[in-house]
């Protein structure tokens, strides 16, 4: 018999301490990694439930195991809410991650060696959009597009020219470090011109899409993938959506997720996804996403006033890239210095970066997490000021310590979990 009095602290104090330290780190640090966010206690409750004990290979009402009647309810709820949230008529909530979701789409619609056209990792794309170190670049013939050096925006004429030249079987729209608005309709027109599938990876902007603050790719893409964390603020996981109405594609996608890419689904995570989707359907979720945009723009305005270069000249979503080439400071060094000031960012390559991906010349900065803990424009501007102060005085530990103290004071006023 398992006693409910069992706890980690008594049994495994070393691990318990690590968990406690990470919990405190999240409270005491300003989180600006664009792909991170904070789950609600409701999501955490679902993810820590007894649903983790259940094996449920297959799909609701078509399982290979018995005893699935209640996890079927949870998965049905997640599917229904995902479709309601995004306007899709197909949803697969089983992918363990965004990369798994993308892998499943590739396997469903392509054969090994087929040509795909996606955004270059160096210009803001994702590993799974054709990077040579990923399955997407190893298994498939990957052709890459980038952004215009002058505007920092996607040049759709260049994308079209590449599509006409290489005749890809699938074109990928989406990004992991691009601050503009993507024209999904233009992507679909290009895909139709060459007879390609259009896959949109909206992992970074799914929350904004759900709130109606960023163009919804569902009316244009054959298939859409996303993560369920980031701007959606749910558990870590993946999601595949479609509104193309093609049942043959839906069947291929389901078979590609299970048994093609995964075995049993994570029932506790699916339940947590269902909770997160319900949260995203509430009116206050749109207000949150509106503030995410306002905070990102507020930070950009301060940094531009301080003489910093922003890739593409600004932001229209939750993130932006800080280009440090003119400062002759590496992203790695800036990341480390800010970390000592309790400000968490991630080093990131900028277009035509002369430095390696392990060093970089830029930082990627996002506003979802600080907004989640209650920051408004005033606090966002203060954070941007601190970032500039630290980078401008990157070897001055007195400045870094001063900023750290001020960060701790602000974090104390805006706890993540009150």
From Swiss-Prot:
<feature type="binding site">
    <location>
        <begin position="125"/>
        <end position="127"/>
    </location>
    <ligand>
        <name>(6S)-5,6,7,8-tetrahydrofolate</name>
    </ligand>
</feature>
<dbReference type="GO" id="GO:0004372">
    <property type="term" value="F:glycine hydroxymethyltransferase activity"/>
</dbReference>
<keyword id="KW-0963">Cytoplasm</keyword>
<dbReference type="GO" id="GO:0005829">
    <property type="term" value="C:cytosol"/>
</dbReference>
<dbReference type="InterPro" id="IPR049943">
    <property type="entry name" value="Ser_HO-MeTrfase-like"/>
</dbReference>
<feature type="binding site">
    <location>
        <position position="121"/>
    </location>
    <ligand>
        <name>(6S)-5,6,7,8-tetrahydrofolate</name>
    </ligand>
</feature>
<dbReference type="GO" id="GO:0035999">
    <property type="term" value="P:tetrahydrofolate interconversion"/>
</dbReference>
<comment type="subunit">
    <text>Homodimer.</text>
</comment>
<keyword id="KW-0808">Transferase</keyword>
<dbReference type="Pfam" id="PF00464">
    <property type="entry name" value="SHMT"/>
</dbReference>
<dbReference type="InterPro" id="IPR015421">
    <property type="entry name" value="PyrdxlP-dep_Trfase_major"/>
</dbReference>
<feature type="site" description="Plays an important role in substrate specificity">
    <location>
        <position position="229"/>
    </location>
</feature>
<dbReference type="InterPro" id="IPR019798">
    <property type="entry name" value="Ser_HO-MeTrfase_PLP_BS"/>
</dbReference>
<comment type="pathway">
    <text>Amino-acid biosynthesis; glycine biosynthesis; glycine from L-serine: step 1/1.</text>
</comment>
<comment type="function">
    <text>Catalyzes the reversible interconversion of serine and glycine with tetrahydrofolate (THF) serving as the one-carbon carrier. This reaction serves as the major source of one-carbon groups required for the biosynthesis of purines, thymidylate, methionine, and other important biomolecules. Also exhibits THF-independent aldolase activity toward beta-hydroxyamino acids, producing glycine and aldehydes, via a retro-aldol mechanism.</text>
</comment>
<feature type="modified residue" description="N6-(pyridoxal phosphate)lysine">
    <location>
        <position position="230"/>
    </location>
</feature>
<dbReference type="GO" id="GO:0030170">
    <property type="term" value="F:pyridoxal phosphate binding"/>
</dbReference>
<comment type="similarity">
    <text>Belongs to the SHMT family.</text>
</comment>
<keyword id="KW-0028">Amino-acid biosynthesis</keyword>
<dbReference type="GO" id="GO:0019264">
    <property type="term" value="P:glycine biosynthetic process from serine"/>
</dbReference>
<feature type="binding site">
    <location>
        <begin position="356"/>
        <end position="358"/>
    </location>
    <ligand>
        <name>(6S)-5,6,7,8-tetrahydrofolate</name>
    </ligand>
</feature>
<keyword id="KW-0663">Pyridoxal phosphate</keyword>
<comment type="pathway">
    <text>One-carbon metabolism; tetrahydrofolate interconversion.</text>
</comment>
<dbReference type="InterPro" id="IPR015422">
    <property type="entry name" value="PyrdxlP-dep_Trfase_small"/>
</dbReference>
<dbReference type="InterPro" id="IPR001085">
    <property type="entry name" value="Ser_HO-MeTrfase"/>
</dbReference>
<dbReference type="InterPro" id="IPR039429">
    <property type="entry name" value="SHMT-like_dom"/>
</dbReference>
<dbReference type="InterPro" id="IPR015424">
    <property type="entry name" value="PyrdxlP-dep_Trfase"/>
</dbReference>
<keyword id="KW-0554">One-carbon metabolism</keyword>
<protein>
    <recommendedName>
        <fullName>Serine hydroxymethyltransferase</fullName>
        <ecNumber>2.1.2.1</ecNumber>
    </recommendedName>
</protein>
């Amino acid at each position: 018999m398992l006693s409910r009095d069992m706890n980690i602290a008594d049994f495994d104090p070393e691990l318990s301490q690590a968990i406690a330290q990470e919990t405190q780190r999240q409270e005491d640090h300003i989180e600006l990694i664009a792909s991170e966010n904070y789950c609600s206690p409701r999501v955490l409750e679902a993810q820590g439930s007894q649903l983790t004990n259940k094996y449920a290979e297959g799909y609701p009402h078509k399982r290979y195991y018995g005893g699935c009647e209640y996890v079927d309810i949870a998965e049905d709820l997640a599917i229904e809410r995902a479709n309601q949230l995004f306007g899709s008529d197909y949803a697969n909530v089983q992918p363990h991650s965004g990369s798994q979701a993308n892998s499943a789409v590739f396997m469903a619609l392509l054969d090994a060696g087929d040509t795909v056209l996606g955004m270059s990792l160096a210009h803001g794309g994702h590993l799974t959009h054709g990077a040579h170190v990923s399955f997407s670049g190893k298994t498939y013939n990957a052709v890459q597009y980038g952004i215009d050096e002058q505007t920092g925006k996607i040049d759709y004429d260049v994308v079209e020219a590449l599509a006409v030249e290489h005749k890809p079987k699938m074109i990928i729209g989406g990004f992991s470090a691009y601050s503009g608005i993507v024209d999904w309709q233009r992507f679909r027109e290009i895909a139709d011109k060459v007879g390609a599938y259009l896959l949109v990876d909206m992992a970074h902007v799914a929350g904004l899409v759900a709130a109606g603050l960023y163009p919804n790719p569902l009316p244009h893409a054959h298939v859409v993938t996303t993560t369920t964390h980031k701007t959606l603020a749910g558990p870590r996981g993946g999601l595949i959506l479609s509104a193309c109405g093609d049942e043959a594609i839906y069947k291929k996608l389901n078979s590609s997720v299970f048994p093609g890419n995964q075995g049993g689904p994570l029932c506790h995570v699916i339940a947590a996804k269902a909770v997160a989707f319900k949260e995203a359907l509430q009116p206050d979720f749109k207000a949150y996403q509106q503030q995410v945009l306002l905070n990102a723009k507020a930070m950009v305005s301060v940094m531009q006033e301080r003489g910093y270069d922003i890739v593409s000249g600004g932001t229209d979503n939750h993130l932006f890239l800080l280009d440090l080439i003119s400062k002759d400071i590496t992203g790695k060094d800036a990341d480390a210095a800010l970390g000592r000031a309790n400000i968490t960012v991630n080093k990131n390559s900028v277009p035509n970066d002369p430095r390696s991906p392990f060093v970089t010349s830029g930082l990627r900065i996002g506003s979802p997490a600080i907004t989640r803990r209650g920051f408004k424009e005033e606090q966002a501007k203060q954070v941007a000021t601190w970032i500039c102060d630290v980078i401008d005085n990157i070897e001055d530990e007195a400045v870094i310590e001063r900023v750290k103290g001020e960060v701790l004071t602000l974090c104390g006023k805006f706890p993540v979990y009150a």
